UniProtKB/Swiss-Prot annotation:
This is Splicing factor 3A subunit 1. Residues 1-41, 318-411, 486-516, 528-582, 664-684 are annotated as: Disordered. One of its GO terms (molecular function) is RNA binding. The gene is Sf3a1. Component of the 17S U2 SnRNP complex, a ribonucleoprotein complex that contains small nuclear RNA (snRNA) U2 and a number of specific proteins. Part of the SF3A subcomplex of the 17S U2 SnRNP complex which is composed of three subunits; SF3A3/SAP61, SF3A2/SAP62 and SF3A1/SAP114. SF3A associates with the splicing factor SF3B and a 12S RNA unit to form the mature 17S U2 small nuclear ribonucleoprotein complex (17S U2 snRNP). SF3A1 functions as a scaffold that interacts directly with both SF3A2 and SF3A3. Identified in the spliceosome 'E' complex, a precursor of the spliceosome 'A' complex. It comes from Mus musculus. The keyword Oxidoreductase does not apply.
Amino acid sequence: MQAGPVQAVPPPPPVATESKQPIEEEASSKEDPTPSKPVVGIIYPPPEVRNIVDKTASFVARNGPEFEARIRQNEINNPKFNFLNPNDPYHAYYRHKVSEFKEGKAQEPSAAIPKVMQQQQQATQQQLPQKVQAQVIQETIVPKEPPPEFEFIADPPSISAFDLDVVKLTAQFVARNGRQFLTQLMQKEQRNYQFDFLRPQHSLFNYFTKLVEQYTKILIPPKGLFSKLKKEAENPREVLDQVCYRVEWAKFQERERKKEEEEKEKERVAYAQIDWHDFVVVETVDFQPNEQGNFPPPTTPEELGARILIQERYEKFGESEEVEMEVESDEEDQEKAEETPSQLDQDTQVQDMDEGSDDEEEGQKVPPPPETPMPPPLPPTPDQVIVRKDYDPKASKPLPPAPAPDEYLVSPITGEKIPASKMQEHMRIGLLDPRWLEQRDRSIREKQSDDEVYAPGLDIESSLKQLAERRTDIFGVEETAIGKKIGEEEIQKPEEKVTWDGHSGSMARTQQAAQANITLQEQIEAIHKAKGLVPEDDTKEKIGPSKPNEIPQQPPPPSSATNIPSSAPPITSVPRPPAMPPPVRTTVVSAVPVMPRPPMASVVRLPPGSVIAPMPPIIHAPRINVVPMPPAAPPIMAPRPPPMIVPTAFVPAPPVAPVPAPAPMPPVHPPPPMEDEPPSKKLKTEDSLMPEEEFLRRNKGPVSIKVQVPNMQDKTEWKLNGQGLVFTLPLTDQVSVIKVKIHEATGMPAGKQKLQYEGIFIKDSNSLAYYNMASGAVIHLALKERGGRKK
């Protein structure tokens, strides 16, 4: 055998071992997410960030871009997920890994790491998607109701241990002995401050009540409590479910709280980003004085307030209220349209005209198409139910009444539109002001002056008639002075006689009134008569009663001389012709003209302040107890009483021509009136009255009294029309009773009444017998003036 060169068997090439190593590397490369060869142009993130990027890319590749958007929304504030932003430097690496995972090239990383670390890493890798999925599931499951509260947990308040023991011990006894024990304890310890927690207004009362409930459940447990405890002891899973639900509820509450805080934070940031001082002037509009623009008309404060109320009503009630307001405005427009033709005829009332115009308009208009039926009305509320006893269900139902056009009534005081339901209250409030009559008259006058064009037909007719009466030069045949009617100059008003009431307070006023009514010619005639230069007219200057002209005059009866008292001095009587009445000499006070006086019953000199009641003239026999004077007696100057004409004496003398230069004579006072005068001719005073007791003895029984009421047209609230009121009263009644009856008959308050009987102002506190009132007595009623002197 030929031996050849011995060649040694070469050792196994290292490739075998090397080939083994790449296999391990390939196996390990399946776990290593990093590529075998780095890609040029991509920035690789650090290892801690690369792990998050790779895991996110794997989930995005499997779940789609919706999962990426969800992660971006949930982790918007997490800086570790900034690689999701396109501007981030690691975003290119993230996109590269997503494409690799979609193509199946990329694998999970597994570098030379201990096995324990690899297991932990795998656990964390598997834990992340589970967390994300758990979050997605938890967002869908929301706890509906809160878990039941803990029954045996009550946080003790911050009080001392002794007080806490007192509260707990009291709660135990109350739970054991019942509420009756609590009531007795409260009554017994109501003054003990340590038991103040038993009062409901105390701060520890709620804690005490909670303890009582807990002790009661322990001492007297409910029915299902034992079965529940037994079930939970046998099945701990149920307790865990309750705990899990409570935890989920706590997490849900926390998420809601965080969400609210985030919304508030976003809103705060948004407000903080606004620059409130940064603005841009886009355009400046200047309006010239003569420029005309399409602007709304100016509004008054009243219209502005009405618009604000309408807006508030619309915001509060919505569109329904606006519809009602539009309906009301349409009704008002119809009323305005109806009032325009109604002005042509003023003889009818406004309501009749409105009704007539409505009928005419309805007759002219085409009947509208049938509308949809109205929905049934709501059931009446209890306060609107009206029970009718005479209701007959079988009777024919009346036609539905037409809608009342007078829902709003015009107030006669203010002229405003007032609802009919509130008119009574409006009138009551409006009439509280006593000046509403003046305001109403003033407004009517102003309205008439403004609306003269629309005067009614009767006013125009009366105005033309008055114009024709006073312009006879145009409308008449007989011409008079312009502005005067035919026969107006002949008709003269009767002179109003000025009468002094006897009070010093009215002296100046009466004097002025007397001077205003006397002309210059009358003053000259009075001076001539006083000087005796002109024969006196006996028919005018005569004082006292006189007989009518058609009755033949008779001589005085001889029996009248017997009435002279024996104590009086002898008086010589001078016979006089019966046809000539005695003239009167009057005293004229300086600066006061002589006025013709009405005939008076008697002449008596009275002190100032007395009152002379005018009496009608009564025909009787001539007097003989008068002191004669020469016919040419000069005027006698008397001391200055009130500035009126004062008759001094009767001068019975035959008519003889007066002597121009008579000798002065001393003043002669008239004698007192005789007792034979009738009682109506004598002026009474309280001193001359008969005592009340004596008058009651002489007169018994009730008397009939007549009260003469004045005619005062300006006092419309009182019935003062000049009528006479007759009352029958006993003599013992006071004057105040008469005033009460006058108030009942006329409405005049007793405080405004002033009663006068035979020249005496009677007082309320005195009786009728005090003033000697007999049957047929006449009492004059007057108005008590305010602010004047007490009368």
